[in-house]
Amino acid sequence: MTATLERRESASLWERFCTWITSTENRLYIGWFGVVMIPTLLTATSVFIIAFVAAPPVDIDGIREPVAGSLLYGNNIISGAIIPSSAAIGIHFYPIWEAASLDEWLYNGGPYQLIVLHFLLGVCCYIGREWELSYRLGMRPWISVAFTAPVAAAAAVFLVYPIGQGSFSDGMPLGISGTFNFMLVFQAEHNILMHPFHQLGVAGVFGGSLFSAMHGSLVTSSLIRETTENESANYGYKFGQEEETYNIVAAHGYFGRLIFQYASFNNSRALHFFLGAWPVVGIWLTSMSVSTMALNLNGFNFNQSVVDSQGRVINTWADILNRANLGMEVMHERNAHNFPLDLASGDSCPVALVAPSING
């Protein structure tokens, strides 16, 4: 018998790279979306850290009154933030090469755009990477669909809202106190608490937390014990086991008696679909609310909607909320505006009868 041996041509560098990129045996899956995700998220993270520590003040309102947000300029972890790009830039694309100098780019808040745009591109690629890994493992694609909810929320406050308002200076600052400031100003200008989509989003987030706690506690309370009383029930589980790890019938019976029968799921697939869909749909709706208010389609305003037979206003909670909104708006951009437009809608009072003459 004669054996013929042929030399196998070695795979090219590109083929080996493709195999490595798409291999599901790696400790961390990279994938083709990861080729874009990794550098963009590393760039966003690096610039965020540097700017949070050392960025100079930014002229956010475009009135030559810079606001400091970095640690080296007197802030701490709570008060520090990446200040949004200047109102003088508007929604123009403002990379480093568009500025006359690096100092000008920093003064006008260029790092904010760099971080936000790289971050959004990176998390969108993360969605694609989740789908790609699911596809290669033969799984269904719903993990990536669920992650579209937080990405939609981030895109709403960092991109859609600034574009709708005409300036990146209206975007959410990248910091703890900056986030709260953004929320207060958003309420003052758009009455978001009275927007139905936002209310549904709150129900989605809080309801999701409630359902998660209920499900976790029910499962933990109905584990099928495979161990002795002297060992943790957790040791009775073997990874990849075919048997159920908890008794869904017992959990269903408990919850059905605690509230009423039809408040409890008796189908595990329907239960877990509900647990996944409820918060995701809620966050989608919240993102839609911010996106609609970007175009000033604001929340409901019921102030002064109740009057007596003489036409006098009977104050309701809506009027208290409206007064709170006006108070927050007064505090916002106090150097750019003396008072909000809502308070300036009355008759104007003349303060000068003759235009002053200017000599020189």
Curated annotation (Swiss-Prot):
UniProt cross-references to Pfam families, sorted A to Z: Photo_RC (PF00124)
Gene Ontology CC entries for this record: chloroplast thylakoid membrane; photosystem II
Binding site for Fe cation: 215, 272
Residues excised as propeptide: 345-360
Site positions for Cleavage: 344-345
UniProt-annotated site: Tyrosine radical intermediate, residues: 161
Binding, chlorophyll a ChlzD1: 118
InterPro entries referenced in this protein's UniProt entry, alphabetically: D1/D2, Photo_II_D1/D2_sf, Photo_RC_L/M, Photo_RC_L/M_CS, PSII_D1
Binding-site list for [CaMn4O5] cluster: 170, 189, 332-333, 342, 344
Cofactor annotation comment: The D1/D2 heterodimer binds P680, chlorophylls that are the primary electron donor of PSII, and subsequent electron acceptors. It shares a non-heme iron and each subunit binds pheophytin, quinone, additional chlorophylls, carotenoids and lipids. D1 provides most of the ligands for the Mn4-Ca-O5 cluster of the oxygen-evolving complex (OEC). There is also a Cl(-1) ion associated with D1 and D2, which is required for oxygen evolution. The PSII complex binds additional chlorophylls, carotenoids and specific lipids.
PROSITE patterns attached to this UniProt entry: REACTION_CENTER (PS00244)
Protein name, per record: Photosystem II protein D1
Organism from which the protein derives: Palmaria palmata
Gene this chain is encoded by: psbA
